Regions:
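A residue-level marker of the well-folded mature domains of exported/periplasmic proteins
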Residues: 2-5, 10-11, 21, 29-327
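Cleavable N-terminal signal peptides
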Residues: 15-16, 26
Length: 327
């Protein structure tokens, strides 16, 4: 090869390499969002079978209406497969951005990646996806929600203090594979593991559902009549557990303590009634924070990988004062 040809080849190779690197860097970033007065956005809800989800949906719809945005809303009815299809439908409809509350961490990865490929930014709200498979700032913009691990930790710490570090515990888990179920279990279980006088004798999913929580609690109470505590990953299952305890001829709040998460109105009423010991808040009113994040992102502002909500803790000392503000 002549000197001239070699030089020309090297220049071409450098240029090609720069183009490839540029493309790789561009693909390593989450899709951009153009600045507009109004947006057409999608909200892919996971289900609508409990007060928490209904409150979240109401907040997202109300804030979109307030801003004058067009909202494409879908309800996956508890199906990860349908939620993936819902996101694909939003992509086909040409939405500007997608707000996704993933039912489970792994099955919703294809939906996130499909939106990225289509150039549509995704904002995860309430629930997260598997962090080993998708990254904030690269595959989606950010996660907006509560610190589920901290929620579980707070529930565990309250229980240690209340029981003096002695308890036989039944755990009612949320939807299998979901980030709140995974993290609320970890946060709580880690606290219990540090207290030798406390033992989790059974842990089973109640799918965040009141009636399923009741059924699972009934079964586990029969298998473990020595249980003194039920930890539920949400108030709906805790309320189901109250019914199960009463059906077993025991007194909730006395014979068996219950601690849970969410802070819904029925949960706070159960605290007032002395049946539920405490509930860690997980605020469902995401509308203002979700849309504010999108507006800031469009303006080019730096969005953190996680936008963590500030939640409260409810027990007998404040439930009566706070119930009017609950959902």
């Amino acid at each position: 090869m002549s000197h001239f040809s070699r030089r020309k080849f090297l220049k071409s190779a450098v240029a090609t390499g720069a183009m490839v690197l540029s493309a790789q860097l561009a693909f390593a970033e989450a899709p951009k969002l153009a600045v507009k007065a109004k947006y057409k956005v999608g909200f892919a809800q996971t289900e609508s079978n409990n007060p928490w989800r209904l409150a979240q949906t109401a907040s997202m719809k109300a804030e979109a209406e307030k801003l004058g945005w067009q909202l494409v809303y879908t309800d996956a009815a508890g199906s990860a497969a349908k939620q993936v299809a819902d996101v694909n439908s939003m992509i086909a409809q040409g939405v500007d951005a997608i707000f996704l509350s993933p039912r489970e961490e792994k099955p919703l990865i294809p939906a996130v990646m499909a939106a990225k490929k289509a150039g549509i930014p995704v904002f995860l709200i309430d629930r997260n996806v598997d962090q080993t498979l998708a990254k904030a700032g690269e595959d989606y913009v950010t996660f907006i929600g509560s610190d589920f691990t901290l929620e579980g930790k707070q529930a565990g710490e309250w229980l240690v203090k209340t029981t003096g570090g002695k308890a036989v515990i039944i755990e009612l888990e949320g939807s299998t594979g979901s980030s709140p179920a995974n993290d609320r279990k970890k946060g709580f279980d880690d606290v219990i593991a540090q207290n030798p006088g406390m033992k989790i004798v059974a842990s089973q999913t109640g799918d965040f559902n009141r009636d399923k929580g009741r059924q699972v609690a009934e079964s586990l109470l029969q298998a473990h009549p020595e249980a003194t505590v039920i930890y539920a990953h949400n108030d709906e299952m805790a309320i189901g557990a109250i019914s199960a305890i009463e059906a077993a001829g025991k007194v909730p709040g006395k014979d068996i303590l219950i601690v849970s998460i969410d802070g819904e109105k029925d949960g706070l009423q159960a605290i007032i009634d002395g049946k539920l010991g405490a509930s860690v808040e997980c605020n469902p009113k995401f509308g203002p924070a979700a849309y504010a994040a999108a507006i800031a992102y469009a303006k080019g502002e730096k969005i953190p990988a996680k936008v963590v909500n500030t939640d409260r803790f409810f027990d007998a000392s404040n439930a009566a004062k706070m119930i009017t503000d609950s959902y």
